[in-house]
């Protein structure tokens, strides 16, 4: 399961989550992550954090924030962070699928190599692959790797879709070019 962080597991902020003390877990997020684990999912956090490239803070800060995240929601198999800004045009910042591909390679040794944004949604590497996020950029990254897509309300987070996932729902529709 590819999972965005802010707005999915914890409340986001227009000024970034700048410290572990600012990380407020959305009620029910821990139980939702545990439900995914009980279903056999491996959890890969994929989060854009441009505050790093903006010089607001460094790697040590993101590690301390993610340490608190793991204390609060449980074991996370992979924590991927894109430090870049939109203008940096990297391959890891969502909606590009770089973080998801890298996490997939770490977890199962395979990833999607190319994305045809104008073509059909690719087949997932694993039929249970899913992306949970609160923004269209999350949905775009998930679409690019063929994952089932679950878009959440940022104030409710993962708890708003966990029952759909448990019920093996097909997920939300998304077209990356509309």
What are these regions (language model features)?
Residues 3-5, 47, 132-134:
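Active-site flanking residues adjacent to catalytic metal/cofactor-binding acidic residues
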Residues 10-12, 54, 139-140:
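Conserved protein kinase catalytic core
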Residues 5, 12-14, 48-49, 84, ...:
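Active-site loop/turn elements of alpha/beta-hydrolase fold enzymes
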Residues 1-44:
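Active-site neighborhood of HAD-like aspartate-dependent phosphohydrolases
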Residues 10-13, 46-48, 116-119:
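A short alpha-helix capping/helix-coil boundary motif
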Residues 19-26, 55-62, 93:
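Flexible, glycine- and charge-enriched loops at secondary-structure boundaries
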Residues 29, 33-62, 66, 75-88:
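Substrate-recognition element of Asp-dependent hydrolases with the DxDx(T/V) motif
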Residues 60-63, 67-73, 77, 87-178:
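Asp-based, Mg2+/Mn2+-dependent phosphohydrolase catalytic module
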């Amino acid at each position: 399961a590819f999972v965005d962080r802010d707005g999915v597991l914890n409340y986001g902020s227009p000024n970034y989550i700048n410290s572990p003390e600012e990380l407020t877990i959305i009620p029910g997020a821990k139980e939702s992550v545990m439900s995914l684990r009980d279903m056999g999912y491996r959890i890969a956090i994929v989060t854009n954090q441009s505050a790093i490239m903006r010089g607001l803070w460094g790697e040590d800060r993101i590690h301390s924030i993610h340490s608190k995240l793991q204390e609060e929601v449980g074991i996370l198999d992979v924590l991927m962070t894109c430090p870049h800004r939109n203008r940096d045009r990297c391959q890891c910042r969502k909606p590009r699928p770089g973080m998801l591909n890298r996490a997939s390679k770490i977890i199962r040794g395979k990833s999607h190599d190319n994305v045809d944004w104008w073509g059909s949604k690719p087949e997932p590497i694993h039929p249970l692959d899913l992306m949970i996020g609160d923004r269209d950029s999350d949905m775009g990254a998930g679409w690019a790797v063929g994952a089932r897509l679950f878009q959440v309300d940022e104030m409710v987070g993962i708890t708003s879709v966990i029952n759909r996932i448990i019920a093996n729902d097909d997920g939300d529709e998304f077209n990356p070019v509309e």
